[in-house]
C-alpha cells in the first residue's frame, strides 16, 4: 500500500527519530541539519491525522499542536467532495467524515508534463500528505502528494496509524518532559490529547460514530439517510460496526428513525 513511501511507526524507527522518516521515492522532506533534527525532530515527521484533529489543533508561536504533539507535515485519508482547478493550483475539499470537509491546495507546476497536475475527480478516496496551514483562522492543507486509494483497507489502516502514532508521540513527549508528573489513569487524557487507549475525537464519539453521524447529517432528504446508502458510502467498514454506531447514536439521541427503521435523520438537522 503505502509502505514504499513511509517507514512504519515501529520501535526501531521511532526510537531513532520519533516517527515516520524520509524514505526515497515516498512522502518526505529534505534532510535537516543535526541541529535542526534536535530542535524540530517531531515537527519534521509526517504524522497521520484525522481532519477533526487538524481542525482542533492549536497554533502557538507558529507551531501547531494536537494536545502535546507538535505537528507540521501530516497525512489524511478521505473522499474528494469537490475539485476546482485554477491556472496555478488545484483546490480539493476532502472529507474523512470526522468533521467538516477540509480545503486541500495542490500547487501546479505549469512546466510539468508528467501528469502530476491532473485533477483527481470527486468521489475518489485519496491519501493526502501535506503541510498544515492557517489563514484568517481557517485551517487548510498544502499538499505535496495526493494519491487515490487502491484498496479501501487503506482507510481503516490509516485510522489505526492515527491512533498508534499519536500514542507513541505523546509517550515520547511525556518522557522527554523533565519533572512532568505521570498520569494517574493512562486510559484517560485531556481533550485533544492522544494518551488514551481509545481514540476519541473532541465531541466524545469514536471515529466510526463520527463518520456515521456526519453522513446522516449531510443527507438533505426529508426522510433522512437509508441504512443501505450508509453501507454503500462506508464500504471500508464492517456492517456490524455501522450497525453498532447507528444503535449507539439512536440511544444517545444524536439521530432518530423516520419513515421506517432503516431511515435516519440527525437531531441537529434543520
UniProtKB/Swiss-Prot annotation:
Keywords: Acetylation, DNA damage, DNA recombination, DNA repair, DNA replication, DNA-binding, Isopeptide bond, Nucleus, Phosphoprotein, Ubl conjugation. GO terms for cellular component: chromatin; chromosome, telomeric region; DNA replication factor A complex; nucleus; PML body; site of double-strand break. It is found in: Nucleus; Nucleus, PML body. One of its GO terms (biological process) is mitotic G1 DNA damage checkpoint signaling. The modification Phosphoserine is found at residues 4, 8, 23, 29, 33. InterPro entries: NA-bd_OB-fold (IPR012340), RFA2-like (IPR040260), Rfa2/RPA32 (IPR014646), RPA_C (IPR014892), WH-like_DNA-bd_sf (IPR036388), WH_DNA-bd_sf (IPR036390). Residues 74-148 bind DNA. The modification Phosphothreonine is found at residue 21. GO terms for molecular function: damaged DNA binding; DNA binding; enzyme binding; G-rich strand telomeric DNA binding; protein phosphatase binding; single-stranded DNA binding; telomeric DNA binding; ubiquitin protein ligase binding. Differentially phosphorylated throughout the cell cycle, becoming phosphorylated at the G1-S transition and dephosphorylated in late mitosis. Mainly phosphorylated at Ser-23 and Ser-29, by cyclin A-CDK2 and cyclin B-CDK1, respectively during DNA replication and mitosis. Dephosphorylation may require the serine/threonine-protein phosphatase 4. Phosphorylation at Ser-23 and Ser-29 is a prerequisite for further phosphorylation. Becomes hyperphosphorylated on additional residues including Ser-4, Ser-8, Thr-21 and Ser-33 in response to DNA damage. Residues 187-270 are annotated as: Interaction with RAD52, TIPIN, UNG and XPA. The keyword Protein transport does not apply. Signal peptide: none annotated. There is a cross-link at residues 37-38 (Glycyl lysine isopeptide (Lys-Gly) (interchain with G-Cter in ubiquitin)). Residues 22-41 are annotated as: Disordered. Its main location: nucleus. Pfam families: RPA_C. Component of the replication protein A complex (RPA/RP-A), a heterotrimeric complex composed of RPA1, RPA2 and RPA3. Interacts with PRPF19; the PRP19-CDC5L complex is recruited to the sites of DNA repair where it ubiquitinates the replication protein A complex (RPA). Interacts with SERTAD3. Interacts with TIPIN. Interacts with TIMELESS. Interacts with PPP4R2; the interaction is direct, DNA damage-dependent and mediates the recruitment of the PP4 catalytic subunit PPP4C. Interacts (hyperphosphorylated) with RAD51. As part of the heterotrimeric replication protein A complex (RPA/RP-A), binds and stabilizes single-stranded DNA intermediates, that form during DNA replication or upon DNA stress. It prevents their reannealing and in parallel, recruits and activates different proteins and complexes involved in DNA metabolism. Thereby, it plays an essential role both in DNA replication and the cellular response to DNA damage. In the cellular response to DNA damage, the RPA complex controls DNA repair and DNA damage checkpoint activation. Belongs to the replication factor A protein 2 family. This is Replication protein A 32 kDa subunit. It comes from Rattus norvegicus (Rat).
